[in-house]
Amino acid sequence: MIPSDLRTDWTVEEARAIHALPFPDLMHRAQTLHRAHFDPTAIETASLLSIKTGGCPEDCGYCAQSAHHDTGVKATKLMATEEVLAAARRAKAAGAQRFCMGAAWRSPKDRDMDRLCDMVQGVAELGLETCMTLGMLSPGQVARLRAAGLDFYNHNIDTSPAYYARIASTRTMEDRLETVEQVRRGGIKVCCGGILGMGEAEEDRIALLVTLATLPAHPDSVPVNLWTEIEGVPVQGRARAVDPFALVRIVALARILMPASVLRLSAGRTEMSDELQALCFLAGANSIFVGDQLLTTGNPAAWKDRDLLTRLGLHVAPARARPLVAAN
C-alpha cells in the first residue's frame, strides 16, 4: 500500500505556496512528515570514490571533469577492481554504509561492464550497499548491473527544466529523465537530485524538486548539492552563494514533496556551518557523505562529522536490508 502522503501529482503552484510558508510552519510540516517515515535521530552514511576521473566528453558547465573545460583535472583510466575494493574496505572501516562509485563518462563502454560488475559484486560481498554513477545506460547495461547486485544508481537532473540549457548542451534534460526511468524500470533504486547555487532563480529550485516529485516514483535518494567553487568552468562566472535559510527551505520542501525519500547533504558541506547542517537535519535531511573527498571536491573530516552528530544527539542509521539478486 502506498502511504497517502506520497504524491506524484504536485504542481509548481502548490510547491511555491508551501515554500513560502512562515519558517516555523514550514519546518513543523517537514519534521512531522520526516518523523512519519524515518527515525529523526538517524543519519545514513555513504562514501564516494571516483573510479575513472576526468576526460568526460559532456560539457556540463559546473563539472571539473569535463574535457571541454581547462580545470587542471587529469584524466585517468578505469581503476582496477582490487583498488576499488581496497577503498571500499577503508570506507566501511570509517563508518560508511553505502559505497558509491563514479566514472566520468557519457556512458560506459560494453568492454568495461565485466570490470564494473566485478566491482559491484565485490563491494556487496563486503556488506556495503552499492551505488554507481556512470552516465547514461542502455537497457542491457542496466540489466547487467542489477544482476551483479547494484542497489542504487545515481543520475542527477542538476537543475530545473527551464534552466538546464544554461548548464549543458551535449545532453538534454529529457536524456537524463530517460536514463532515470530506465534505471527504475530495470529494478535498481534511483538516486537523483540537483545542484543549488549555479545562478538559478528560486523558481528553478522549486521546479527542480517538482520535477523529481512528479516522476512515476519518487527517487529513493535525493542528493542536495551546493555549488562549490571550481576555476575554469562556465558556471563559475554566474554562480551565486545560496542563502542559508534558502537552503533549509529547499530541504524542507523536498521532505514535504517526497516524504519517504532519503535526502542527502552532498557537495558543499565544507561551506556549511554546524548550525546550518543542524537546521537541514531538522528540515528532513538524513544522509551525508563521509570521507574527506568526494569526486573532485572536499568533504568535512570524519572527526568533524562524528563530533557534530554527537553534539546533536544523532546516530548513524543501520544499513537497510539489501534484497538478494541472482548474478549471471
Curated annotation (Swiss-Prot):
Please tell me which top-level EC class this enzyme sits in.
transferase
Alphabetically list the UniProt keywords: 2Fe-2S, 4Fe-4S, Biotin biosynthesis, Iron, Iron-sulfur, Metal-binding, S-adenosyl-L-methionine, Transferase
The processes (GO biological process) annotated in the record are: biotin biosynthetic process
Cofactor remark: Binds 1 [4Fe-4S] cluster. The cluster is coordinated with 3 cysteines and an exchangeable S-adenosyl-L-methionine.
Q: Which SMART domains match?
A: BATS (SM00876), Elp3 (SM00729)
One MF annotation (Gene Ontology) recorded for this entry: iron ion binding
In this protein, which residues make up the domain named Radical SAM core? 41-260
Pathway involvement of the protein, from the record? Cofactor biosynthesis; biotin biosynthesis; biotin from 7,8-diaminononanoate: step 2/2
Domain of life of the organism encoding this protein: Bacteria
Q: Secretion signal: which residues?
A: none
Q: Which cofactor does it need?
A: [4Fe-4S] cluster; [2Fe-2S] cluster
* Catalytic activity field: (4R,5S)-dethiobiotin + (sulfur carrier)-SH + 2 reduced [2Fe-2S]-[ferredoxin] + 2 S-adenosyl-L-methionine = (sulfur carrier)-H + biotin + 2 5'-deoxyadenosine + 2 L-methionine + 2 oxidized [2Fe-2S]-[ferredoxin]
Cited Pfam families: BATS, Radical_SAM
Q: Which Enzyme Commission number(s) are on file for it? A: 2.8.1.6
Annotated [2Fe-2S] cluster binding lies at 100, 131, 191, 264
Kindly give the Gene3D superfamilies that the UniProt entry links to this protein: Aldolase class I (3.20.20.70)
The UniProt entry, under SUPFAM superfamilies, shows: Radical SAM enzymes
Listed binding positions for [4Fe-4S] cluster are 56, 60, 63
Subunit info here reads: Homodimer.
Function comment: Catalyzes the conversion of dethiobiotin (DTB) to biotin by the insertion of a sulfur atom into dethiobiotin via a radical-based mechanism.
| Family, similarity comment | Belongs to the radical SAM superfamily. Biotin synthase family.
Q: What is this protein called?
A: Biotin synthase
Question: Which species does the entry assign this protein to?
Answer: Cereibacter sphaeroides (strain KD131 / KCTC 12085) (Rhodobacter sphaeroides)
